[in-house]
C-alpha cells in the first residue's frame, strides 16, 4: 500500500506493546487516525508515549470503536484466533502485522531473517557486517524487528542506500501479505510455539515461509540445505522466481546442485558463485571460545551468504566475523565461580535450542531448565540428556512436566525460584564441571522476557560467587 493512501484512514492497533505503540506513531505521522486498543493494562511508559503522540488508546478490553476502522494492525503476541481479530476479519477489515505496515514506508534495502533457532545471532552478525561496510561506503545499517527495536520506529529515517536487517518471528510474518525482502534468510525449522499452532509444525512452517511469498526476480533466498523441512520445501515446490542460495556444513553434499552455495571444506568457509568455488576464510578465524558449535557455524554461513548477496565488501565480512564474540543470553559464558563454569542460554526457548547447547557443553553438566511450556516434546532429547547431564534443576510452570519426562533418566530437583535453582546447581555441580541454564521454555511465567530471565540468572550466579 502507498502510505499516501493512509491519510485520514481510521486504523485500529491491537496491542499496546513496543510494536503497537511504534505502529501507532508511524500511522499518526502519515496522517492516519490510529486507535490503540489493549485487552490488558497499558504500561505507564507506553501511555506517556501515546499521549505525547496525540494517539488515543483504550485498555481493559476492546470496545466497539475498534471495529469502525478500515485497517487493523495486530501486535505479534496476539494470535489470529483471538476473538477481536476473528471479528475484524468477519467484518471485512484488513488485518496486517506491524512488519507489513512498516514495509509500506521502507525505502531501504531489506534483509529479513527467520527460523526457529539462530535468527538473532544471524541477524546480529549480518547487521555488524553491514554496519562495518556502511562506515566505509557511506550507508547505514539498521537492526530492527523481533531483535528488539520495532521496524516502525526506524523506517521513516531510512534512505534508499541503507540496509534494514530484520529479525522476523512467525508471529510477525503471519500478518504479512506484500512484505518483500530483497534478501530472505531461513536458518532452520523445528517444532516451536506448538501451543499457538495446534501442534502442527506445517502450520508453523507456513508462517515462516511467508518471508519469501512476495519475493520476485532480482531477490535472493538463502536457506539451510541441511534442514530436512527446508530442503523438502525449496527442492519440491519450485521453480522459484528469485535466486536461491544454499548453506550447509559439507561442501560435498552440493555435488550435482546447480545453485550457488556457502559451505565448509578442508577447514575453510567456501563460496560457490556461477559455478566457481573460492576459499573465503578459515573456520578457525571465526569459531572461538564464547562462539562455538555447529549451530553457530550455520549462522556464520547464512551471514556470509547474505553479505555476498547484498554486495558487501569481503574485507568487511572477514573483519566483522573475526571480531565477533557471540550474543548475550546465547550460550553466554558468565564466568567460573566456585570451581564451576556457568553458562547463560536464556534465549533457548524450545527443545531444539536446548539440544544445540547440550551438544556444545562438555558432559557431566548440571542443567537448569523450565518456564512456560510451549507444547514441548522432552522425550526427543532424553538420550542426549542421559549422555551429557548429571542432574536437572527444574523451574517454572513446566517443572513438573520436566521432572516427569526425565524420571529414570537423570536425577531431577525442583526449585521454586531461579535463585534457588542456582544454589541447588552449585551444590550439585562437580569441581571443574559446568552449569548450563537452557530453559527450553518461554519466560513469561516468572519474568518479563528471556533477557530479564538471563540477567537475573547472571545476577544470582554473581551473588553466589563468594562461596
From Swiss-Prot:
InterPro entries: Mur-like_cat_sf (IPR036565), Mur_ligase_C (IPR004101), Mur_ligase_C_dom_sf (IPR036615), Mur_ligase_cen (IPR013221), MurD (IPR005762). One of its GO terms (biological process) is cell wall organization. GO terms for cellular component: cytoplasm. Pathway: Cell wall biogenesis; peptidoglycan biosynthesis. The keyword Ion transport does not apply. The lineage of its organism: Bacteria, Pseudomonadati, Chlorobiota, Chlorobiia, Chlorobiales. This is UDP-N-acetylmuramoylalanine--D-glutamate ligase. Its main location: cytoplasm. Pfam families: Mur_ligase_C, Mur_ligase_M, MurD-like_N, MurD_N. Keywords: ATP-binding, Cell cycle, Cell division, Cell shape, Cell wall biogenesis/degradation, Cytoplasm, Ligase, Nucleotide-binding, Peptidoglycan synthesis. The keyword Membrane does not apply. Belongs to the MurCDEF family. GO terms for molecular function: ATP binding; UDP-N-acetylmuramoylalanine-D-glutamate ligase activity. The gene is murD. Its EC number is 6.3.2.9. It comes from Chlorobaculum parvum (strain DSM 263 / NCIMB 8327) (Chlorobium vibrioforme subsp. thiosulfatophilum). Cell wall formation. Catalyzes the addition of glutamate to the nucleotide precursor UDP-N-acetylmuramoyl-L-alanine (UMA).
Amino acid at each position: 500500500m502507498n502510505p499516501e493512501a493512509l491519510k485520514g484512514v481510521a486504523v485500529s492497533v491491537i496491542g499496546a506493546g513496543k510494536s503497537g505503540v511504534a505502529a501507532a506513531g508511524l500511522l499518526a505521522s502519515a496522517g492516519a487516525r490510529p486507535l490503540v486498543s489493549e485487552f490488558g493494562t497499558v504500561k505507564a511508559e507506553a501511555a506517556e508515549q501515546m499521549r505525547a503522540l496525540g494517539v488515543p488508546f483504550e485498555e481493559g478490553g476492546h470496545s466497539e470503536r475498534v471495529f469502525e476502522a478500515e485497517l487493523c494492525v495486530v501486535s505479534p503476541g496476539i494470535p489470529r484466533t483471538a476473538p477481536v481479530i476473528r471479528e475484524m476479519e468477519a467484518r471485512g477489515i484488513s488485518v496486517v502485522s506491524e512488519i507489513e505496515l512498516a514495509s509500506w514506508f521502507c525505502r531501504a534495502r531489506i534483509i529479513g531473517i527467520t527460523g526457529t533457532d539462530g535468527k538473532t545471532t544471524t541477524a546480529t552478525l549480518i547487521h555488524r557486517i553491514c554496519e562495518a561496510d556502511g562506515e566505509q561506503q557511506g550507508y547505514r545499517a539498521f537492526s530492527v524487528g523481533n531483535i528488539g527495536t520495532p521496524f516502525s520506529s526506524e523506517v521513516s529515517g531510512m534512505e534508499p542506500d541503507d540496509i534494514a536487517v530484520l529479525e522476523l518471528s512467525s508471529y510477525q510474518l503471519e500478518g504479512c501479505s506484500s512484505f518483500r525482502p530483497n534478501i530472505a534468510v531461513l536458518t532452520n525449522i523445528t517444532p516451536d510455539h506448538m501451543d499457538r499452532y495446534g501442534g502442527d509444525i506445517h502450520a508453523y512452517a507456513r508462517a515462516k515461509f511467508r518471508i519469501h511469498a512476495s519475493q520476485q526476480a532480482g531477490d535472493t533466498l538463502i536457506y539451510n540445505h541441511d534442514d530436512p523441512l527446508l530442503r523438502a520445501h525449496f527442492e519440491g515446490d519450485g521453480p522459484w522466481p528469485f535466486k536461491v542460495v544454499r548453506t550447509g556444513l559439507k561442501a560435498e553434499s552440493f555435488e550435482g546442485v546447480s545453485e550457488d552455495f556457502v559451505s565448509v571444506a578442508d577447514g575453510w568457509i567456501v563460496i560457490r558463485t556461477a559455478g566457481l568455488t573460492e576459499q573465503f576464510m578459515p573456520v578457525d578465524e571465526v569459531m572461538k571460545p564464547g562462539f562455538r558449535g555447529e549451530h553457530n557455524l550455520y549462522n556464520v554461513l547464512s551471514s556470509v551468504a547474505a553479505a555476498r548477496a547484498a554486495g558487501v565488501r569481503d574485507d568487511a565480512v572477514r573483519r566483522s566475523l573475526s571480531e565477533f564474540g557471540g550474543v548475550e543470553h546465547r550460550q553466554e559464558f558468565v564466568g567460573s565461580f566456585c570451581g564451576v563454569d556457568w553458562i547463560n542460554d536464556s534465549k533457548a526457548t524450545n527443545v531444539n535450542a536446548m539440544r544445540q547447547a547440550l551438544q556444545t557443553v562438555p558432559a557431566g553438566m548440571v542443567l537448569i531448565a523450565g518456564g512456560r511450556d510451549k507444547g514441548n516434546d522432552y522425550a526427543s532429547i532424553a538420550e542426549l540428556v542421559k549422555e551429557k547431564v548429571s542432574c536437572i534443576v527444574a523451574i517454572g510452570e513446566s517443572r513438573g512436566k520436566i521432572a516427569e519426562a526425565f524420571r529414570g533418566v537423570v536425577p531431577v530437583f525442583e526449585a521454586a525460584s531461579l535463585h534457588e535453582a542456582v544454589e541447588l546447581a552449585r551444590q550439585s555441580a562437580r569441581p571443574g564441571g559446568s552449569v548450563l541454564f537452557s530453559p527450553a521454555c518461554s519466560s513469561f511465567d516468572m519474568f518479563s522476557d528471556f533477557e530479564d530471565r538471563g540477567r537475573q540468572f547472571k545476577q544470582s550466579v554473581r551473588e553466589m560467587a563468594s562461596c
